[in-house]
Amino acid sequence: MKIAFAALALGAFAITASSSTSATADEPFEGRVVAEAKLDAAGKKATIVLKGKDASTYINKDYPAKCSVSIAEGGKLEKAELKKEDGKYEDAGKEGKAKSLTFTVGADKSITGECKIVACSDSSCSSPFKVTFKSN
């Protein structure tokens, strides 16, 4: 009987411990990441920057971030789908985390779109979510 009780208690502890060290966070990350897009003055390319609103929010470098981009009517867009490999990360000095992720795409008119990413704090990461952007 003591062995059965000990096994039950140990099992309950293991379940509790594993749920508290989950890789995804209970804290909301969606409002802590911004996406900024800007068309250059020459009207030849657009830059999209994804970053945390504060220094404690990071972009997860291990998640395959991707963006869907559309251009204003009559405009020319170099690429409508951007992947992680198309971007450049600004390293945060923490394994798997970046301060920002920047994409550059050829565009001659304003762009809009959304990016699917994972954000992290020092202790946890979000589930994948989308952020939207619109350039000048």
Label for each model-derived stretch:
Residues 2-3:
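Bacterial Sec-dependent N-terminal signal peptides
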Residues 24-136:
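Extracellular/lumen-exposed scaffold segments
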Residues 6-16:
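Bacterial N-terminal signal peptides
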Residues 17-25:
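Boundary at the C-terminal end of the N-terminal hydrophobic targeting segment
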